[in-house]
Amino acid sequence: MDKFKIDGRCTLNGEVTISGAKNAALPILFATLLCDEEIHLSNVPRLKDVGTTLKLLEMLGATTKVNGNVTVLTGAVNNHVAPYELVKTMRASILALGPLAARFGAADVSLPGGCAIGARPVNLHVHGLELMGAKIAIEDGYIKARVDGRLKGAHILMDMVSVTGTENLMMAATLADGRTVIENAAREPEVVDLANFLNALGAKVQGAGTDTLTIDGVERLHGGSYSVQPDRIETGTFLVGAAVTGGKVTCRKTDPSLLEAVLVKLEEAGALIEKGADWITLDMTGRTLKPVTIKTAPYPAFPTDMQAQFTVLNAVAKGTGMVTETIFENRFMHVPELVRMGADIELQGNVAICRDTEQLKGAQVMATDLRASASLVLAGFVAEGSTIVDRIYHIDRGYEDIEHKLQGLGGCIERIKG
């Protein structure tokens, strides 16, 4: 397995171009199953999860082409089984369920894997599709959906806010007969991006970005072109990198409006922030890093995907900061690794209390999930000495070309092939 070797005590400075958002690109790719015409996508990040999604689409019968941009044609799809071999590596594969059931009346999707940060129940997806008329059985490790004719519009009240649940049901509803209303819907920017994509293909989705979605089903969707929105979590990760190393970094081709909760906390931590329509600059030069109190919650509150990075920020700031995780259980697996580097962090249930650490020390640490791995890389830049981060296949799932981007900012990081 590949690993990263990081030489510490370095400062990140310069400009970095932000990639397209993984969490927007994946549902958009699955949404191509709703249409039998050619679709051209730009700003799709080159990531392991994107490659897995394209492989799954091809296994279902689609034709894909990658040449900088991504072209998908699903007219020849003749298979409705998303097998365990692919689904086990990526939880987002559950997003094939709604489109396959809506367009073909049949979907067999293996129960998902690919993530170690806690249970993400599929019952929300199943219950919503059942309300729309699908008959669903869970057997042999698969969710098996069958539809007699077309799905029917329904009123769906989601028990809890779920991004993938909202996305799956929204996609299915675009081809249902009648109107579907989804209450307690996720408001995340990635949900909005998916809705905008669907509307570009002829869907009728209203209310994206609010907690109530209204979808009027249409007979069919047509082909088209679409550009995936920038990755707000990648943006936030580079900004935290500048903050913890005392540097100055400008993120280009991003959208400041997508991470307001993060920017507020970075300013609270002592950073000077400037922003324009598609750029953000964070300057920490000569400034003192202060701890912050954060509590993760669904958008527009503080994102759970930035929690690990801010745990590092609090660990190296002067004073005591608190991080409360309310979205996922088991999402502090980076903490024992940071403690190995000398961080003074105490876990009390879903709260991490981060106390002033005089100096992190380089160590051999292990990545346990996507965002945890990014936090360990940032900690390595702050630490004294060298840090080895093992199992970086996690980071390759969600950060495009991360070592070269960090090298461009002055980071001393190299990939050691396994």
UniProtKB/Swiss-Prot annotation:
Gene3D superfamilies: Enolpyruvate transferase domain. The active site is at C115. It is found in: Cytoplasm. Pathway: Cell wall biogenesis; peptidoglycan biosynthesis. The keyword Signal does not apply. UDP-N-acetyl-alpha-D-glucosamine binds at R91, D305, I327. The modification 2-(S-cysteinyl)pyruvic acid O-phosphothioketal is found at C115. Keywords: Cell cycle, Cell division, Cell shape, Cell wall biogenesis/degradation, Cytoplasm, Peptidoglycan synthesis, Pyruvate, Transferase. One of its GO terms (biological process) is cell division. GO terms for molecular function: UDP-N-acetylglucosamine 1-carboxyvinyltransferase activity. GO terms for cellular component: cytoplasm. Cell wall formation. Adds enolpyruvyl to UDP-N-acetylglucosamine. This is UDP-N-acetylglucosamine 1-carboxyvinyltransferase.
